[in-house]
Amino acid sequence: MKKTTITLFVLTSVFHSGNVFSRQYNFDYGSLSLPPGENASFLSVETLPGNYVVDVYLNNQLKETTELYFKSMTQTLEPCLTKEKLIKYGIAIQELHGLQFDNEQCVLLEHSPLKYTYNAANQSLLLNAPSKILSPIDSEIADENIWDDGINAFLLNYRANYLHSKVGGEDSYFGQIQPGFNFGPWRLRNLSSWQNLSSEKKFESAYIYAERGLKKIKSKLTVGDKYTSADLFDSVPFRGFSLNKDESMIPFSQRTYYPTIRGIAKTNATVEVRQNGYLIYSTSVPPGQFEIGREQIADLGVGVGVLDVSIYEKNGQVQNYTVPYSTPVLSLPDGYSKYSVTIGRYREVNNDYIDPVFFEGTYIYGLPYGFTLFGGVQWVNIYNSYAIGASKDIGEYGALSFDWKTSVSKTDTSNENGHAYGIRYNKNIAQTNTEVSLASHYYYSKNYRTFSEAIHSSEHDEFYDKNKKSTTSMLLSQALGSLGSVNLSYNYDKYWKHEGKKSIIASYGKNLNGVSLSLSYTKSTSKISEENEDLFSFLLSVPLQKLTNHEMYATYQNSSSSKHDMNHDLGITGVAFNSQLTWQARGQIEDKSKNQKATFLNASWRGTYGEIGANYSHNEINRDIGMNVSGGVIAHSSGITFGQSISDTAALVEAKGVSGAKVLGLPGVRTDFRGYTISSYLTPYMNNFISIDPTTLPINTDIRQTDIQVVPTEGAIVKAVYKTSVGTNALIRITRTNGKPLALGTVLSLKNNDGVIQSTSIVGEDGQAYVSGLSGVQKLIASWGNKPSDTCTVFYSLPDKNKGQISFLNGVCK
């Protein structure tokens, strides 16, 4: 028999379905001169049923790379596509009338208008569908039939800070936990914090609530502690239940806005963010500019309104200012409605005030020609309020709304009536990359009060001295192209008896070839506390990669205040180990006292099981040492998994037996010793892809596909299961009982004890084949034809120890 040499690498590149780097090669099989029937399987490998990893295309658009079962049909293979798979690919199932299924719930494609072509050589499945059976294209929201409520699980986020000061030997602690439990569509959440500052201990529970989505009516039901909607009235904390339209389920919806908190710290400081008196966030910051972004605020369950920011300086000074957190103009498309209903008890952080039961309802409806009408009520035994308003989408000029409110505050002696009106304006200028948001509310009479003001004033007459007359806020964001960008935030509260308080935060940023420049200005005034201060900061960052071959930056920062304080700060910042390690070393000199010098060191590490950090500061009179740790824990049916902090919506990655595999896009996130990890920052109701880096797989492990698509509902912990092959990777030479090698093109199927095919490979020259995931307990079945007699079972033995990546074995097929 004449033989032609073909390398094993080429054969496995063409036919080994588990290889994600495969290429297509073409051969003249006639040149092999094989005996009749010996190469039958080789030349028609696509007719052999089994599990194959394929690229799935619908009308020439790649939908996913996944493992599918292909069943044998006449002269071809037919993929097993379930109804869920077709929905996932964008097929409108309701348009496929009389759809038929086999016993394995696979759609019988021959009875549908859906056509397919399977190409075994390049591992692709081409689906073609007429436009009439395609779902409407929506770049945001996935089909609700594949929304995944996730697994039942207990989850916990934790964060702890510790600081020790040598002077006085004081220790301070701050801890925060976010326990939760998922059961079906229900989400139970809590946020609690504990702090010990200068021997003063304090524990707070910001909220505890249960929540679920109602996809049929695109709404969200909440029971427990939450905040009311801020569309018409000020957001207030309550304990009760609410039903709200959930816009995250709506295509092209108006997404929730979260503010960015910016400020300037003059020393090592603690920043606390509160809303309605509740502590929702606390962190330590070094001197200079700081920014608390959307990522830190989004998962804390805050309500729309005003965020109170306090900066506690090391020298005892305290900065206080507010950050407006307002909603855009209430402008809805024609026929679209939005509502919220709340019944509960007002939840006051200070027990000195009353907490009455109240009802609040709001309704917004979009009309033709860009008009929107809205109205709402607040009812309580000591207070009633009514609101009506309208908005107009004025096209290229933005959107404008007007609302009118009336309130009745009930006292022991009389009812006090008041009125207020408000104007909001939003504009996004695409041509100039400008975003403007303005909001102004004027209390037409002194007796007008919001719900919160009525609660406070009913118990304390001195509240009248702080009765608001108006409140104005503005947000401006302007991109300047190559010149950088500018951000401006302004908030002014005026009172009937005094000027009130004002805060202005302005910043400018510019980046040129890696060199970044940042200017920041903060002004805060308060006639109530008689606090006035202006802070200015200048920051310059220069990359040092070309000099050090590492990701490092040199920074200079100058901070000054209207109280004649000026600091010069010089430092080096670095990132290493694929962004897992960040570190910083800085020195500071105070202009007021040339001898007042300080040194700051800090570093943080993001790993598989969480994040840990340490900081050190030193000057002539004090020395501080601090540590912080944070992370997340999920307890599920398969055990307990530790990881980095869990976002509101996340995935539990399962790759059994594969430890140390890296999840792409998340620094430090790798599978643990069992093959589990946590992948956060998923977007609810949308297609999310979770990818594992195949180059990080340990020796003698393999995964059938590297990308998994999930569509979680809000708050879900979805399971992303990777099919793994753990065991010896071997080059095995297989012979028949007569000593002759298996024929070229024979298909090897590795089956587990349940008969499920784990992997397939093709026999090459001289009966050799590459097989992955051998453990000695699976069945290795060889097949070379379509008749039942054209199979045999391969018997082999594994070495006791495998020091290399590939074992070389011999096997006999009987």
Swiss-Prot record:
Record organism: Salmonella enteritidis
GO biological process: pilus assembly
Signal peptide, first to last residue: 1-30
Entry protein name: Outer membrane usher protein SefC
Alphabetical UniProt keywords: Cell outer membrane, Disulfide bond, Fimbrium biogenesis, Membrane, Signal, Transmembrane, Transmembrane beta strand, Transport
Superkingdom of origin organism: Bacteria
Transmembrane spans: none
Pfam families: PapC_C, PapC_N, Usher
A GO MF term: fimbrial usher porin activity
